[in-house]
């Protein structure tokens, strides 16, 4: 298990229906001209049947004040494949993204979802990735997604974004004793820094309220 960082705890505490605390990225792709009609179906199948194993933070869920490994990880809950209604314009795409992005992520599961969206005009498809800010910040999350992509349009090797090893996953591969020491050390540091973090955050909020009185 890994303790929640105080700032992550604040993000979770402040979240409400009208104020979601997740971030999202939308990637738009062109289907190759010579691709078969089953291109998207094959892509989705390859992702779902990938032998790569989900790694932290993508296989972690909230367990009290800790992140814990989800022993019953269900890929179908997180990875979704949909087709836009015709005519499949950017308008329909953004309507779908707006609806999905407004929904809070289920806290009983790892806090992310990924959508492959086909049926976009111009022979295109999209990937929409949503992840909670408490799990990973937006920039780091998008970097992990980009690592799973290839510059080679003919590349067949697929590593799903949730299987890409980032710095956090490497830290968690340390021996168990080292990880326990790391958790205790991290928890001690976080408890010591909590008052300062809360003070700095409150000052930022007050400044924003001063700039935006409404």
Regions of interest found by a model, annotated:
Residues 17-19, 104-105:
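A general structural signal for short secondary-structure junctions and capping/turn motifs
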Residues 1, 10-17, 67:
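Membrane-targeting and insertion segments and their boundary/processing signals
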Residues 1-4, 26-36, 45-51, 57-214:
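Soluble acyl-CoA-dependent acyltransferase catalytic core bearing the H(X)4D motif
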Residues 7-14, 21-29:
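M16 family metallopeptidases and their MPP-like homologs
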């Amino acid at each position: 298990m890994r303790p929640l960082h105080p700032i992550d705890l604040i993000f979770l505490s402040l979240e409400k229906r009208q104020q979601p605390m997740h971030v999202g990225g939308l990637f738009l792709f062109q289907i190759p001209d010579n691709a078969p009609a089953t291109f998207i179906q094959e892509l989705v199948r390859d992702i779902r049947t990938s032998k790569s194993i989900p790694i932290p933070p993508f296989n972690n869920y909230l367990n009290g004040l800790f992140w814990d490994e989800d022993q019953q990880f269900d890929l179908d809950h997180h990875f979704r494949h949909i087709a836009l209604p015709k005519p499949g314009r950017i308008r329909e795409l953004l309507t779908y993204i707006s609806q999905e992005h407004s929904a809070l992520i289920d806290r009983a599961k790892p806090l992310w979802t990924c959508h492959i969206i086909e049926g976009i005009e111009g022979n295109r498809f999209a990937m929409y990735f949503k992840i909670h800010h408490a799990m990973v910040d937006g920039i780091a999350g998008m970097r992990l997604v980009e690592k799973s992509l290839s510059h080679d349009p003919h590349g067949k090797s697929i590593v799903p974004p949730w299987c890409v090893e980032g710095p956090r996953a490497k830290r968690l591969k340390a021996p168990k004793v080292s990880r326990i020491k790391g958790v205790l050390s991290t928890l001690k540091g976080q408890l010591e820094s909590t008052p300062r973090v809360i003070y700095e955050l409150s000052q930022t909020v007050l400044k924003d309220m001063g700039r935006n009185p409404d």
